[in-house]
Regions:
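Hydrophobic transmembrane alpha-helices of secondary-active solute transporters
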Residues: 37, 41, 72, 106, ...
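Juxtamembrane intracellular "pre-TM" segments in multi-pass secondary transporters
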Residues: 114-144
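Helix-loop-helix hairpin linking two adjacent transmembrane segments in secondary transporters
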Residues: 25-29, 58-60, 67-112, 158, ...
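A generic transmembrane-helix signature of 12-TM secondary carrier transporters
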Residues: 11, 15-18, 33, 100-107
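Small-residue-rich segments within alpha-helical transmembrane domains of MFS-like 12-TM solute carriers
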Residues: 22, 38-46, 77, 153
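Extracytoplasmic gate region of multi-pass secondary transporters
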Residues: 139-171
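Conserved MFS/SLC helix-loop-helix module at the cytosolic interface between two early adjacent transmembrane helices
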Residues: 1-25
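Cytoplasmic helix-loop-helix junction between adjacent transmembrane helices
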Residues: 27, 33-71
Length: 171
């Protein structure tokens, strides 16, 4: 797929996944939708990094990636407390409705502002691409990254109780 199309599809999957979370009739549907959004989210940032670097001069590539990931950082810093506030005041589904709305806006922004790639999509061989996972150092690096991010996001689970019950912050 062309890169812009890939970004749009991934954002659509992410948005639909969050909509499914907001409408989930039971726990297992919620978890399945969360897994769907996780795959789309991670892949989106991989493709987004490639798109960001393709839009700027060689000496600006690192800055382009930094700017793109600043959005993720800001979303984490502001979105987690805001989502918690929404959930506490309007119910947990409100948080997923809010993220769905953000996804719709992001989809529109991508559609309007990201230029279409002039280059044809690169051909790929899935078997060759996955063969790199047979190399120990690559697998170790990937596992380290996954475990690191699992740790980061696990902390978010306990952050609110830690702040309210241990340090005495109010809800």
């Amino acid at each position: 797929w062309p890169r812009k199309t890939a970004l749009l599809v991934l954002m659509a999957v992410f948005t639909i996944g969050n909509l499914a979370c907001a409408l989930a009739p039971n726990y297992w549907t919620l978890m399945a939708a969360r897994v769907l959004t996780a795959f789309a989210h991670g892949t989106f940032f991989g493709v987004g990094s490639v798109v960001a670097t393709s839009l700027v001069a060689s000496d600006k590539k690192a800055s382009a990636i930094a700017i793109m990931f600043t959005g993720l950082t800001v979303a984490t810093i502001l979105g987690v407390p805001f989502g918690t506030w929404l959930g506490q005041h309007f119910g947990w589904r409100a948080t997923f409705w809010a993220v769905t709305l953000v996804g719709v806006v992001a989809f529109a922004i991508i559609a309007l502002l990201v230029p279409a790639s002039k280059d044809a999509p690169e051909a790929f061989n899935l078997r060759e691409d996955l063969a790199v996972l047979k190399r120990g150092p690559v697998l170790a690096g990937l596992l380290t990254t996954v475990l690191g991010w699992v740790g980061v996001f696990a902390v978010f689970t306990y952050l609110a109780p830690l702040l309210t019950k241990v340090t005495g912050f109010s809800d």
